[in-house]
UniProtKB/Swiss-Prot annotation:
Co-factor note (free text): Binds 1 NAD(+) per subunit.
Lineage: Bacteria, Pseudomonadati, Pseudomonadota, Gammaproteobacteria, Lysobacterales
Gene name of this polypeptide: hutU
InterPro entries per the UniProt record, alphabetical: Urocanase (IPR055351), Urocanase-like (IPR023637), Urocanase_C (IPR035401), Urocanase_central_sf (IPR038364), Urocanase_CS (IPR023636), Urocanase_N (IPR035400), Urocanase_Rossmann-like (IPR035085), Urocanase_sf (IPR036190)
UniProt signal peptide: none
GO molecular function annotation: urocanate hydratase activity
UniProt name for this protein: Urocanate hydratase
Gene Ontology cellular-component terms listed: cytoplasm
Enzyme class, UniProt record, top EC level: lyase
Biological processes, Gene Ontology terms: L-histidine catabolic process to glutamate and formamide; L-histidine catabolic process to glutamate and formate
Active site: C409
Free-text function comment from the UniProt entry: Catalyzes the conversion of urocanate to 4-imidazolone-5-propionate.
Organism of provenance: Stenotrophomonas maltophilia (strain K279a)
Coiled-coil region list: none
Length: 555
């Protein structure tokens, strides 16, 4: 079992020459490889895409076997992938998924980091995060619009919709957290983001998500102060330990206008640098003494939350951004760790009630012009949404593609299927140079159960009911998605979430159009269904408006 191979450099093929037997198998092949592109993955030589140890394949032997299997797979066969390892090929039918993926799922009694890490060390499991092991990660862009929408809503609720001259403090510039600086600037606020790894800061600078950096707190604060006074938002990365820096700001009485965090706190061994440790010590001890790392990291997380609570008490809008930091602190004795809310119940849930979430697509041609054309098609088909148009304009101007050109665009029920069918027609008539794939984050309205994040504080108390993502995966399979995934532990760690993903290929065929129409209607409809069942009036109204047949919910 080879987990680390510095000699490997992976990039997705581009153009129209097939390496597999059809676009239905070429697409997962390219997207798997794209997940490990050096400009996409955090540690590609270790197969780590993002989020601590979120991998694309269990080991390099499994990666090679997946690639070879996809190349020979027929269009009436389905490949089964178990925690990043290809385990079977079975005869199904042309409208069945070409790949079915299950990653890091454990029986609830054993669904904890200790048991998972034991399996992981034996080579029996793989942590797939959300889009790492489901082969639809598109770099930091994948989370940037959701982060932008959150910051815009924070500005609307707390500052009358204007973040000019305001600044956000946060931690973490990894694959998810790296979206925060650009999202803040897009929303009109400056951002001070603390990151312990210089390599992560360098990647955000290289890909355009961060404006500048320093290793000196006073210099960082000077840069933030200058940008706020000028009314020109700027993002500053600070090399350091976020728990130390936030405590120092509280001690000095320096108050940010907004406060959150996106360190990989969900994984106390691999995701959070303990206070007083160097990164080199941490990297060594993660292997040699993981229990010592976990103990020290958890203590630091508790201090981190205490500082956040201090600012919350001072009136600073403070929000958990879904990394389970509050839970870790609660388990370390911080009884009021949940005094400030998570971002979904505070800012995003009304969108989920209408099935609106992180719709994304990637151009298999590798040509950025294909994304420009699809951006224009979105504007054409959704002409009366200036907020969406502004997002697309900003994305085109400010977001650098990582790996295959891609776009993230939050749209909901009734729009996703229209866009998918339009993209398929653009492939059919030659407007696009090659097929596109359409997928989404597992962070969506109907595809996740995560009581400390997406399903926190549900109106009916159904936060932990995980039937919904299972039904979502089953329905997407029945509807004809090209690949479907069912994961455990993404975002918030082992024992705290179950979630499902889907990807569908627009190859320009009539058969694809039928699948697209089913999948891209049914997938967001499950989100409306889930929230209607929980009693949200917005979702109930949406379900009635769209004519959903929900017999046990609408009567």
């Amino acid at each position: 079992m080879t987990r680390n191979d510095p000699s490997r450099t992976i990039a997705a093929p581009t153009g129209t020459t097939l390496n597999a037997k059809s676009w239905l198998t070429e697409a997962p092949l390219r997207m798997l490889m794209n997940n490990l592109h050096p400009d996409v993955a955090e540690r590609p030589q270790e197969l780590v895409v993002y989020g601590g140890i979120g991998r694309a394949a269990r080991d390099w032997e499994s990666f090679d076997a997946i690639v070879e299997t996809l190349k020979r797979l027929d269009d009436d066969q389905t490949l089964l992938v178990q925690s990043g390892k290809p385990v079977g090929v079975f005869r199904t039918h042309a409208d069945a998924p070409r790949v079915l993926i299950a990653n890091s799922n454990l029986v609830p009694r054993w669904a904890n980091w200790d048991h998972f890490n034991e399996l992981d060390r034996k080579g029996l499991a793989m942590y797939g995060q959300m889009t790492a092991g489901s082969w639809i990660y598109i770099g930091a862009q994948g989370i940037v619009q959701g982060t932008y929408e959150t910051f815009v809503e924070m500005g609307r609720q707390h500052f009358g919709g204007d973040l000019t001259g305001k600044w956000l403090f946060t931690g973490g510039l990894g694959g998810m957290g790296g979206a925060q600086p650009l999202a803040a600037v897009m929303a009109g606020a400056s951002c001070l983001a603390v990151e312990c790894r210089k390599s992560s800061i360098d990647m955000r600078l290289r890909t355009g998500y961060l404006d500048t950096w320093t290793d000196n707190l006073d210099e960082a604060l000077r840069l933030i102060d200058e940008s706020c006074k000028a009314g020109t938002p700027k993002s500053v990365g600070l090399l350091g330990n976020v728990a130390d820096v936030l405590a120092e700001l509280l001690k000095r009485g320096v108050k940010p206008d907004l406060l959150t965090d996106q360190t990989s706190a969900h994984d106390p061994v691999n995701g959070y640098l303990p206070q007083g440790w160097t990164v080199e010590q941490w990297d060594e001890k993660r292997v040699s003494a993981p229990k010592d790392v976990e103990k020290a990291a958890r203590a630091s997380m508790a201090n981190h939350i205490r500082a956040m609570l201090g600012f919350h008490a001072l009136g600073v809008p403070t929000v958990d951004y879904g990394n389970n930091l509050r839970q870790m602190a609660l388990e370390e004795g911080v009884a009021n760790a949940f005094d400030f809310p998570g971002f979904v119940p505070a800012y995003i849930r009304p969108l989920f009630c209408r099935g609106i979430g992180p719709f994304r697509w990637a151009a298999l041609s590798g040509d950025p012009e294909d994304i420009a054309k699809t951006d224009a098609k979105v504007k054409e088909l959704i002409p009366d949404n200036p907020h969406l148009h502004r997002w697309l304009d900003m994305a085109a101007e400010k977001i650098k593609f990582q790996g295959l050109p891609a776009r993230i665009c939050w749209v909901g029920l009734g729009d996703r299927d229209r866009l998918g069918l339009a993209f398929n027609e653009m492939v059919a008539n030659g407007e696009l140079k090659a097929p596109v794939v359409i997928g989404r984050d597992h962070l969506d309205s109907g595809s996740v159960a995560s009581p400390n994040r997406e399903t926190e504080a549900m109106a009916d108390g159904s936060d932990a009911v995980s039937d919904w993502p299972l039904l979502n995966a089953l329905l997407n399979t029945a509807s004809g998605a090209t690949w479907v995934s069912l994961h455990h532990g993404g975002g918030v760690g082992m024992g705290f979430s179950q979630h499902a993903g889907m990807v569908i290929v627009c190859d320009g065929t009539e058969a694809a159009a039928k699948r697209i129409g089913r999948v891209l209607w049914n997938d967001p409809a499950t989100g409306v269904m889930r929230h209607a069942d929980a009693g949200y009036d917005i979702a109930i109204d949406c379900a009635k408006e769209k004519g959903l047949d929900l017999p046990g919910i609408l009567g």
